[in-house]
Amino acid sequence: MEMKKRISLELRNRTPAEVAELVVDNCRSSDGEIEGLTDDFKELEFLSMVNVGLTSLAKLPSLPKLRKLELSDNNISGTLETLAEKCANLTYLNLSGNKIKELSTLEALQNLKNLKSLDLFNCEITTLEDYRESIFELLPQVTYLDGFDAEDNEAPDSEADDDDDDEDGDEGAGQLGEYEEEEEEDEEGSEGGEVGLSYLMKEDIQDEEDDDDYVEEEEEEGGEEEADVRGEKRKREAEDEGEDDDEDDD
């Protein structure tokens, strides 16, 4: 998909001025140039154009609020001065996997006074002797190079991410409290349910016992009735025999 069309789709019924984050990774640039991105994206803070075939940043529009820029896995070898001109507030820049070979190419980044983190993984420049020391000397404003500072301490999350985490933590705590309350209610409900179930089971057992007693009573009554019937039958047979004897005597 062409970059211009991809950007249009990513708007999702928003105006460019409403977009703070834009990701157009793996689309196709036109002749290695940026297209479809305009000055109207004035609120853009995060832009990712990974593996889009860029060779130049010359057509990058003015993005005064842009703080994070992902440009890894492209074919950029220069024109980095555009970044200082168009994205003065940039704090994080990822140029990993590009065609950057010389320290002189990075001199243009000296004017990015707010740049704190720079990634150059898989760029030829990383094979130079004293590469890290040279970058920190060339760009003193940079604190983290390829994820580590000059003392080999790993970069922490950004302040923005920390703020987001704090907010998420507060929300999470509230949600956890609600969850615990619901869980307690569920436990109480479960206990009540167990009592009710136990009670019902006892009732069912009692009903079954009553039914058994009723059946036994019916059987006993049936047995008594059968005994009465048999008694009556024997009585009638005895009377009949008596009558027969009287007739014989006559």
Curated annotation (Swiss-Prot):
GO terms for biological process: chromatin organization; regulation of apoptotic process. The modification Phosphoserine is found at residue 8. Residues 149-171, 178-191, 205-227, 239-250 have a biased composition (Acidic residues). Residues 228-238 have a biased composition (Basic and acidic residues). Coiled coil: none annotated. Phosphorylated. The phosphorylation is nuclear localization signal (NLS)-dependent. It is found in: Cytoplasm; Nucleus. Residues 194-247 are annotated as: ZID domain. Histone chaperone that specifically mediates the genome-wide removal of histone H2A.Z/H2AZ1 from the nucleosome: removes H2A.Z/H2AZ1 from its normal sites of deposition, especially from enhancer and insulator regions. Not involved in deposition of H2A.Z/H2AZ1 in the nucleosome. May stabilize the evicted H2A.Z/H2AZ1-H2B dimer, thus shifting the equilibrium towards dissociation and the off-chromatin state. Inhibits activity of protein phosphatase 2A (PP2A). Does not inhibit protein phosphatase 1. May play a role in cerebellar development and synaptogenesis. The H2A.Z-interacting domain (ZID) mediates a direct interaction with H2A.Z/H2AZ1. Component of a SWR1-like complex. Interacts with H2A.Z/H2AZ1. This is Acidic leucine-rich nuclear phosphoprotein 32 family member E. It comes from Danio rerio (Zebrafish). The gene is anp32e.
